Swiss-Prot record:
GO terms for biological process: arginyl-tRNA aminoacylation. One of its GO terms (molecular function) is arginine-tRNA ligase activity. This is Arginine--tRNA ligase. It comes from the Bacteria. Its main location: cytoplasm.
Amino acid sequence: MQAHFASEFMLSLAHALESQLRAAIDRAFPEAAASARESGTGLDPQLAPASKPEFGDFQANAALPLAKPLKQPPRQIAAAIVDQLMVDTAFTAICLTPEIAGPGFINLTVRPECLAAEVQARLADARLGVPLVEGDNDGQQPTPVVVDFSSPNIAKEMHVGHLRSTIIGDSLARVLEFRGHPVLRLNHVGDWGTQFGMLITHLKQVAPEALETADAVDLGDLVVFYRQAKQRFDDDEAFQTTSREEVVKLQGGDPISLKAWSLLCDQSRREFQKIYDRLDVRLNERGESFYNAYLESVVEDLNVSGLLVSDDGAQCVFLEGVTGKDGKPLPVIVQKSDGGFNYATTDLAAMRYRFAAPPQGDGARRVIYVTDAGQANHFAGVFQVAQRAGWIPDAGRLQHVPFGLVQGEDGKKLKTRAGDTVRLRELLDEAVERAESDLRRRLQEEGRDEDESFIEQVATTVGLAAVKYADLSQNRITNYQFSFDRMLALQGNTAPYLLYAVVRIAGIARKGGDLDVTTAELQFSETQEWALVRELLKFDAVIAEVEEELLPNRLCTYLFELSQVFNRFYDQVPVLKAEQPSRSCRLALCRLTADTLKLGLSLLGIPTLERM
């Protein structure tokens, strides 16, 4: 299914101008156009957004590559194309008279009244010009998209690596949902595997009564519980033997082992949910154990399709085009020599299920995995196996969305002073505490008196927003350095800077500016007004880009640039003190800026404030 962006303003303008330019080139140079068509290329207008505001809105560079075949100077070619554009009424309805610049660039400026009309339309449109995705041609609903993210392990605490997966995945899911895709947000928790042998054995020995009575068990700090079990497993051979027997019992469906397993899972789930609630992240848990019933048939399927090879007793699929150091093809092991299954088997079962038509599966057509870049080779391997097994439909897309490490300011992996992994809960607590102390200091400096509920709300919103935004504003593929000072700064590409722009506009309303003002016709004359108009009208194209490229930092960069353009506008152009009709037109720009920032930030999972 193709995403359609026909109603998007700048994109649809670009499409219209491109076809008008092609037609103008055809009319100006029919022979050259015909021979280009015969060679199967056609003449490319080379239309692109203008590199600088003084060059207009778009630049067409078609005249330069035509100079050689036509044996004419490029400026002369550009002039002939412009002459043809000016007799096209559809073109003159959109653009002012083009300018020829430099060696033969054609600069195109959209008519001010077209831009103003689009601003007017967006003021009445809650979607701000972003269309809903269309379904398939036969009128069906858009097909589901699966976003697999967060995925912590049971009995282990969520750490800073889970933070990246959780907030990047949540933001991508929000953008896809906003576009109208049915999104299945899946939390593929690690709730199965050999580690449960030692955890259940430890639980049976330290809290045997829980297995008789409890619907829930409080094991205190699960991380400590895990460490104790691991320590005993490493030190005590008898414990090790019992743990291995426990794995077999669990896999065989022994009721007491299953009860112990579900108590462990429930306690972990409650801890995870506290984090998800704080971050305002929704997830449907579907752990590894869900796929247990499908593992044997995955191996069977691969065998039937002739992909399975027995290698030293293990069942493997050898990858095409991927070799090890010895030059031989690398295997994906789907069943170990002892008959056991592994991560790859579970991931393959999940892929098959997610693409399979309901009720045998989710019926997805796009499945997105948000994990650290260290898993890139693993996913490349299982993706290839799933493709070759025929489990991915023709229009299906499997995408791995990798991200880099979170580093300390020293450029090394983020650790506590004691050298431990940073717990997510503690990191979020510290962000809120620091935001609170910054706020109290600022209130004191400004001589402002605010009640405790205001301080708590602002500190919580700003602290959590700062953590989310610092992560999302980086290109996810790179490692990023975690710095509380940088992310909480009121200046620069930070959440507080963007939140403050929204607060500034709310302040205009409090000072008597009616942001819901309606004007018959918007008119702008100042350079800063037009700069803000043009920036506001890029929003829909940015959302299209994030949906396709799966890069939330593109949205962050746009919102930061919009805030900068707005602040320049507000500092240099009077709004509340302006005469009518300028006052109403400028208030309309303030309102659309606030709407765009609020919607953009909500797609990053960040709520806004009226006051800071």
